[in-house]
Amino acid sequence: MKTKIFETTKNDIEEAGRLIQNGEVVAFPTETVYGLGANATNESAIKKVFVAKGRPADNPLIMTVADAAQLDEFVTISDQARGLMDHFWPGSLTVILPIKPGKVSMLVTGGLQTVAFRLPANDAARTLIRAAGVPIVGPSANTSGKPSPTTAQHVWHDMQNKIAGIVDDGPTQVGVESTVVDMSISTPIILRPGAVTQPQLEEVLQMKVIDATSTESVASNVTPKAPGMKYRHYAPDKNVVMFDELDALELKQVLAPNDVVMAKDDMIEKMALTNHQAWSLGNTLETATEQLFAGLRFYDDDSQITTIYVQKMPPIGIGKAFNNRLGKAAGNQEFQN
């Protein structure tokens, strides 16, 4: 299969939408990471997503829509869930809801009685879904377990000749996947951190929201409710090690010639890394998160690199999502001075 690159022109997106209508898989941009789009009501198309990614069959898929009205056919929506969608959609929030009997393929749900939905803030994504005329599944458009793609080039690296097309809308803005909140139960639970934070959810809901993202792993015989909970995710082939700001100067003393550092600009300046490559994470939590997967992918492709040392961020705001993804990429391996 030859993979075609589409621009975000009207004609290109309509052509990409027809491919999805016809059961093909097309990667598409969102504000978080690039997704792998296929008709969520076509089991043959859904299977192609699992094959392209090498994704375990019990890892549920997120359904992606262009309009919240599309959900009513598939799920039961509480007043609280609808309030979240009204406030945060389009945006970086995925909501888990109870399905209506027989309305969602078990390939999407992993056999659960719930399904996750998202309405992305990217115009090209929503236009593509409208062109396809159906809700689409939208897992990250990377080989399963590897760092998520934040550019069309990242998607091409993993998916060339495995999928029908890629819609290129440049780099994503957020850089990590959406927040996942389980609204199928009485007390909402965050299962994956993202740009939408626990305090923001609690402010809208006016109720307690449990953050389970530090204890969200599940047993090997249990189907996870959300992606990222059960299997290794976000991990390059290279060794990744986290480090704290207070350990930076000690780390500099033990860096091997083929080690590299990913850190904020002030940290790179403090470490004075004249003899080592360094990947800038910018000056803010937002720029750091935007650049995390791009840096991991860049160094993973360099055969000369041995270890990637990455600065941890303060666990506030989107910094919590940054540390979550970094911890998984590193297998929770931290530098010890």
Outline where the language-model segments fall.
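Active-site-adjacent structural elements in enzyme catalytic cores
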Residues: M1-N337
